[in-house]
């Protein structure tokens, strides 16, 4: 779990996301509160429940990007899902409890990675010995082994082929069978390969010919897993989910009931009702054991173009007590998105063209023109936020991108006049497209 202060979390998000200070503050405080709760002792620690968040804002203003960046910062089990993927319990499709099962799998992956790091030195030594055994045989003299060990460490034997016995997981072609109504069996999907493997005496190694350089990764994973206690790992992963798990529930506005519909919708109101106990706190059966969701943090987000937050079930609104509104982006925001963020669109474009030997330069008035065109098209057609910049920028560099191979060594300056020339028909075409079937 991250130990960053709220200020540090916000400044880290600022590197990639322009504006939206209120949303950044809300998620930073929520993330820090996870750490604060861990410092409490006794019964009070169990009583402190996470304050779930509802982020409201137009499309393309940074809601999903905040989730992506938060996942890297959290250093805790984090899962981003779309609310539209789920259906009401009892119907064909994924039910909302699958969220917790997926979160447990994420936690197991994180915990396994951490455990592997802890035994890395021992695993490296074991992997090296297995490669040496394959190269010179287990009965070789110590002097021979030392000589080959030196060559191995100096990468002199990387292109040599060896035969190793690697334990393989189920073959890729083995089918998955769904068994309806099996709780916690990962949607009831049973891998026949796993079942056959266990019936035939476990995962026995299969001799494979492989280059020395390619052998290290599978051998390291195999030797690390031998040194890790799987049962303890799963217990630790479940504990991490229960105390530090974070679920980002995107597109929650799409599961609001349609006006004028009296019956519950399979993938709308029914899903909202199923989410209630999950967010409030319940116990979900998974194939690794029961998981409590009392202290899992839920961050929901939606554009609410057609519906409004009040259209959500009142009980669901009550379970998302912190409400944050994200602001539509302005011309200045667009200019910052183009230039100021760490992996800005202009930096990406310039770097891509440099691979062809073409040097692109954007003048300040070109950046201003790009931002203004994006805002104009958003206001006249459909507001898709920062995503509009990609449309405009691709239109501007389309010709350069197509002919870049023939222009190696050139420097291509892009100014406001060039931008206007390339995008002059964009807004009018977009307007006309409304009337063309």
Curated annotation (Swiss-Prot):
UniProt GO molecular function: ATP binding; ATP hydrolysis activity; peptidase activity; proteasome-activating activity
The keyword ATP-binding belongs to this UniProt entry's keyword annotation: yes
Keywords: ATP-binding, Chaperone, Cytoplasm, Nucleotide-binding, Stress response
Main location: cytoplasm
Record GO biological process: protein unfolding; proteolysis involved in protein catabolic process
Cellular localisation: Cytoplasm
Any single Gene Ontology cellular-component annotation: HslUV protease complex
Signal sequence coordinates: none
Record's keyword annotation contains Chaperone: yes
InterPro entries given in the database record: AAA+_ATPase, ATP-dep_Clp_protease_ClpX, ATPase_AAA_core, Clp_ATPase_C, HslU, P-loop_NTPase
Stored Pfam families: AAA (PF00004), AAA_2 (PF07724), ClpB_D2-small (PF10431)
UniProt cross-references to CDD domains, sorted A to Z: RecA-like_HslU
Binding site residues for ATP: 18, 60-65, 250, 315, 387
NCBIfam families documented for this protein: hslU (TIGR00390), PRK05201.1 (NF003544)
Protein task: ATPase subunit of a proteasome-like degradation complex; this subunit has chaperone activity. The binding of ATP and its subsequent hydrolysis by HslU are essential for unfolding of protein substrates subsequently hydrolyzed by HslV. HslU recognizes the N-terminal part of its protein substrates and unfolds these before they are guided to HslV for hydrolysis.
Subunit organization: A double ring-shaped homohexamer of HslV is capped on each side by a ring-shaped HslU homohexamer. The assembly of the HslU/HslV complex is dependent on binding of ATP.
UniProt similarity note: Belongs to the ClpX chaperone family. HslU subfamily.
Protein name stated in the entry: ATP-dependent protease ATPase subunit HslU
Organism listed in the record: Methylobacterium radiotolerans (strain ATCC 27329 / DSM 1819 / JCM 2831 / NBRC 15690 / NCIMB 10815 / 0-1)
Gene: hslU
